[in-house]
Each structure stands twice: as C-alpha cells, then as structure tokens.
C-alpha cells in the first residue's frame, strides 16, 4: 500500500523530486506523457547538485512550456510504497505555480498539456497526486478556484 505523508520541512539533501500544482487563469494544468494515456501534475527528479527550486522551474518549463509564472513552495511530501525505491520513504517538495504565458511548443517527453476546469479521472499516479492536490488545497486555501 502506498503511504503519502506531509511535512513543513525536511533536510534539503533528502529532497529528490519536485511536483508542481499548476494553474493558469483559474484552470488546472496537467501533462500527458507521450507513452501514457493518463494525466499528471508537472514534476520530476532533481538533478545532482541542483537546487530544489531550480528543479521545479526546470520541470515546469520542460513539461508545460511555462515561460512566465510565479512559483512558491507549499510543503514537503514523502511517498513510501512497496516496489518503489525498495519500499524506502522518498521525499519531494510540493510547489504551487500560476502560469501567465506558455511557449507554443513542448520540447520534452510530454505530448501535450491539458488546461481543465476539473481534475482528471485517469491519473498516472492515482495513489499519490490526488493527495498532493488535496494538501495543496488545504495549505493554500485555494481549493478548486
């Protein structure tokens, strides 16, 4: 069973991922990977020596084409799941982004972005990302607006 937990902070060296809950003009922004039939929030792995904020900026640009945006850290999250990193707890930083402008073309493994009024039914990570959004809503007070 997958376990997701939330923290106010964690040792920077433990942060391996950045996930960005992304909105534009009051709508949700999700990514569709070219090899999947599901949607996901933008995010990805931290590169060696990379600041976690830079990870979030890089992933947001690579996966959505966002070129004008505000970006704020929300909280630390962790995931523990059998078969995922040998069942070890892994940590990431959850961010909130408001995108004002996108590039016209994507330059990554992402086939397209979807700008939606509602949350997806088919998630790439159904045991994780809906919980991240719920925590984002709780901590930011933004809800589905």
PLM regions with names:
Residues 22-25, 97-99:
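Active-site beta-strand termini and strand-to-loop segments that position acidic
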Residues 1-19:
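Acidic, metal-coordinating catalytic segment for phosphate/diphosphate chemistry
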Residues 46-70, 77-131:
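Unchanged
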Residues 125-145:
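…; additionally, a secondary subgroup of soluble metalloenzymes is captured
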Residues 23-62:
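Conserved Nudix-box catalytic region and its N-terminal flanking loop in Nudix hydrolases
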Residues 15-17, 23, 34-36, 41, ...:
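Short connector loops at helix/strand junctions that flank enzyme active sites
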Residues 4-10, 77-89, 138-141, 145:
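Class I (Rossmann-like) S-adenosyl-L-methionine-dependent methyltransferase catalytic domain
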């Amino acid at each position: 069973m997958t376990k997701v937990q939330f923290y106010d902070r964690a040792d920077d060296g433990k942060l391996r991922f950045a996930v960005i809950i992304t909105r534009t003009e009051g709508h949700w922004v999700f990514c569709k990977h070219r090899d999947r039939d599901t949607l996901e929030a933008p995010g990805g792995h931290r590169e060696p020596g990379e600041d976690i904020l830079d990870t979030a900026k890089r992933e947001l640009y690579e996966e959505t084409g966002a070129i004008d945006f505000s970006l704020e850290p929300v909280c630390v999250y962790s995931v523990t799941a059998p078969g995922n990193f040998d069942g070890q707890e892994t940590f990431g930083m959850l961010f909130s982004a408001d995108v004002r402008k996108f590039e016209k073309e994507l330059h990554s493994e992402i086939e397209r972005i979807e700008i939606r009024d509602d949350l997806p039914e088919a998630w790439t990570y159904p045991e994780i990302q809906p919980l991240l959004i719920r925590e984002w809503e709780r901590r930011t007070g933004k809800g589905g607006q």
